[in-house]
Swiss-Prot record:
Binding residue positions for FAD: 186, 192, 225, 365, 384, 452, 473, 477
Protein name per the record: Acyl-coenzyme A oxidase 2, peroxisomal
Gene3D superfamilies, sorted: Butyryl-CoA Dehydrogenase, subunit A, domain 2, Butyryl-CoA Dehydrogenase, subunit A, domain 3
Designated gene of the protein: ACX2
Annotated organism of origin: Arabidopsis thaliana
InterPro entries (UniProt xref): ACO (IPR034171), ACOX_C_alpha1 (IPR055060), Acyl-CoA_Oxase/DH_mid-dom (IPR006091), Acyl-CoA_Oxase/DH_mid-dom_sf (IPR046373), Acyl-CoA_oxidase (IPR012258), Acyl-CoA_oxidase_C (IPR002655), AcylCo_DH-like_C (IPR036250), AcylCoA_DH/oxidase_NM_dom_sf (IPR009100)
Presence of keyword Membrane: no
């Protein structure tokens, strides 16, 4: 050992230099694909600098205007109001009870002081309502959800399920927050299966009243927002029970909605027969007062039945324009689809905040670099680009998809077109499920991408992740919602082969089903040129081919298994395939809307930036599911390799305009409120937070 040391003497300085060189060599493997280490070239700066010198000069103002549309002013008004009121800003450390009171005061301030009246737009201008909801959720997600409970759920149920007498009586009180309310649908034993709800509303013809009862513990209304502290009313979903003159004695007319007062308007004391308990501390959204409700023979006037789709006369006669329980139930739930639309839209808002924080920090943070050269931004490392750039592209994709959803929803509210109602119902189910699931995963990626500083509560990833987590469950469990999409696709598939027509959203199945189900062209399967891979037609055709193939395969599987397992058993046996089908279809819709948004962008530089993001979104999704395309020879091995290389290159190119892309969200520092993402003196502000 001694002799070896003598033969190869090395000073401590040389040893440290060798270790540093090895580490830099290893780190170079994380750099962008074109940054190949060479003995004669620096490891980082050459390609990075040349690429930056050629990067797009993006008109940020034009891009932001195109992104944010016509409701910028109302969002800026909300941001400015809360920035001017430090007493209404949510601190990092706050108790559950204090957070609930703050959240209520925030909503009161927004409505009564700032003069923002969201309820006025729920029915008449949904696009503006959802823009308000996005801005409010950026301030505090608990506030966004509390606002949604008050106006979209409680208020929305009154104006959508009730008639003129209900709107006349309750609208102003809901609007100005005198009538705070709840949406009491979920029960301890039933959530997704709304038709299985057990709470009853029995008509008493002698007193012209309904009697609301909780028949057992499983029927206790659970997770009801606004119930634990602030709510005065509840829209209670219950089984309508009518007396009959036959041997049964009563008739179950299915689930209907009823307005039930739960607290005294003056004293705020719980009313007789109503029991309210607090659901307690939650993983997130602790500014929302979720409670549990039990009813013991609570009597309400007959007029409190929200009777748009079914009514009961003074003598107990039931009337409805819809002939069956299932049709009435479908119409009722169809009117409540706005909640899903809002959650999909709000989830994109959360994704914008998290992407902004992670990318601004990654541009600021510098670690390591070639010998005797400056350290480089961690966003110059290929591994960081791989984490964040496809996510940034996806954020834009989901933005345009949810904007489209809101537009279709607004059109539906104006026209009440039956086919459009069905279309929006399926599209909202799919986008709510897909987008919220993606955002939940992306929040963890963003937190990790910011290293140890991402773990600090003040930098918001923890609260964003915890608050958003429930988005995957409420307003419909994501797995259940995807099954609705799959069921709708199968229905359309069946109609096609029985000579029917398909609706607009699924039109590609009508137009090109035979083309997509034919054998792949062996020539185009090998094309690997950049122009071809970045051609929107190739990208959209690939997405549509996958969905069509999956649809055909799952239909055949269901038919095969139904012979031995029955319909329910066959569905369960094919469930994973059905979920994959639904996700594939939603991705196809998302890409189609992104391509359309790129095409319609009026500013050339903004359009070029969007095209980069769109290409990255499309090719990244194809690469992530490359096995599906390879299995059917839709993509040859050389083409798969070219897609992978181009995806890495596009991540590098999007990195070069990442600042402009996140700046277009126009989330000022007082909205993101994360010291590591401050646009000036971030480190200085971060040290001040901890007391230096």
């Amino acid at each position: 050992m001694e002799s070896r040391r003598e033969k190869n003497p090395m000073t401590e300085e040389e040893s440290d230099g060798l270790i540093a060189a090895r580490r830099i060599q290893r780190l170079s493997l994380h750099l962008s694909p074109s940054l190949t280490p060479s003995p004669s070239l620096p490891l980082v700066q050459t390609e990075t600098c040349s690429a930056r010198s050629k990067k797009l000069d993006v008109n940020g103002e034009a891009l932001s205007l195109y992104m944010r549309g016509k409701h910028i002013d109302i969002q800026e008004k909300i941001f400015d109001f809360f920035n001017s009121r430090p007493d209404l800003q949510t601190p990092i450390e706050i108790s559950k009870d204090d957070h609930r009171e703050l959240c209520m005061n925030q909503l009161i301030g927004l409505v009564r002081e700032a003069g923002v009246r969201p309820f006025r737009y729920v029915a008449d201008d949904p696009e503006k309502y959802f823009a308000i909801m996005e801005a409010v959720g950026s301030v505090d997600m608990s506030l966004g959800i509390k606002m949604g409970v008050q106006y979209s759920l409680w208020g929305g149920s009154v104006i959508n399920l009730g008639t003129k007498k209900h709107r006349d009586k309750y609208f102003d009180g809901i609007d100005n927050l005198d009538y705070t309310g709840c949406f009491a649908m979920t029960e301890l034993h039933h959530g997704s299966n709304v038709q299985g709800l057990q709470t009853t509303a029995t008509f008493d013809p002698l007193k012209d009243e309904f009697v609301i009862d909780t028949p057992n513990d499983g029927a206790i209304k659970w997770w009801i927002g606004n119930a634990a502290v602030h709510g005065k009313f509840a829209t209670v979903f219950a089984r309508l029970i009518l007396p009959t003159h036959d041997s049964k004695g009563v008739s179950d007319m299915g689930v209907h909605a009823f307005i039930v007062p739960i607290r005294d308007m003056k004293t705020h004391q719980t009313l007789p027969g109503v029991e309210i308990q607090d659901c307690g501390h939650k993983v997130g959204l602790n500014g929302v007062d979720n409670g549990a409700l039990r009813f013991r023979s609570v009597r309400i006037p007959r007029d409190n039945l929200l009777n748009r789709f079914g009514d009961v006369s003074r003598d107990g006669t039931y009337t409805s324009s819809l002939p069956t329980i299932n049709k009435r139930f479908g119409a009722t739930l169809g009117e409540l689809v706005g909640g899903r639309v809002g959650l999909a839209y709000a989830s994109v808002g959360v994704l914008k905040i998290s992407a902004t924080i992670a990318i601004r920090y990654s541009l600021l943070r510098q670690q390591f670099g070639p010998p005797k050269q400056p350290e480089v931004s961690i966003l110059d490392y290929q591994s960081q680009q791989h984490k964040l750039m496809p996510m940034l592209a996806s954020t834009y994709a989901y933005h345009f998809a949810t904007v489209y959803l809101v537009e279709k929803y607004s059109e539906m509210k104006k026209t009440h077109d039956e086919q459009l109602v069905a279309d929006v119902h399926a599209l909202s189910a799919g986008l709510k499920s897909y987008v919220t699931s993606y955002t939940a995963k992306a929040l963890s990626v963003c937190r990790e991408a910011c290293g140890g500083h991402g773990y600090a509560a003040v930098n918001r990833f923890g609260s964003l992740r915890n608050d958003h987590d429930i988005f995957q469950t409420f307003e419909g469990d994501n797995t259940v919602l995807l099954q609705q999409v799959a069921a709708d696709l199968l229905k359309r598939y069946k109609e096609k082969f029985q000579g029917g027509t398909l609706t607009v959203t699924w039109s590609y199945l009508r137009e090109s089903m035979n083309t997509y189900l034919s054998q792949p062209n062996p020539v185009t399967a090998r094309w690997e040129g950049e122009d071809h891979l970045r051609d929107p037609k190739f990208q959209l055709d690939a997405f549509r081919y996958r969905t069509s193939r999956l649809l055909q395969n799952v239909a055949a599987r269901l038919q095969k298994h139904s012979k031995t397992l029955g319909g329910f058993g066959a569905w369960n046996r094919c469930l994973n395939h059905l979920l994959t089908l639904a996700e594939s279809h939603i991705e196809t819709v998302i890409l189609a809307k992104f391509i359309e948004a790129v095409k319609n962008c009026p500013d050339p530089s903004a359009k070029a930036a969007l095209k980069l993001a769109c290409d990255l979104y499309a090719l990244d999704r194809i690469w992530k599911d490359i096995g599906t395309y390879r299995n059917v020879d839709y993509v040859a091995p050389n083409k798969a390799k070219a897609i992978h290389k181009l995806t890495e290159y596009l991540s590098f190119q999007v990195r070069n305009v990442a600042k402009e892309l996140v700046d277009a969200f126009e989330l000022p520092d007082h909205v993101t409120r994360a010291p590591i993402a401050m646009q000036s003196d971030a480190y200085s502000q971060y040290t001040q937070v901890v007391g230096f």
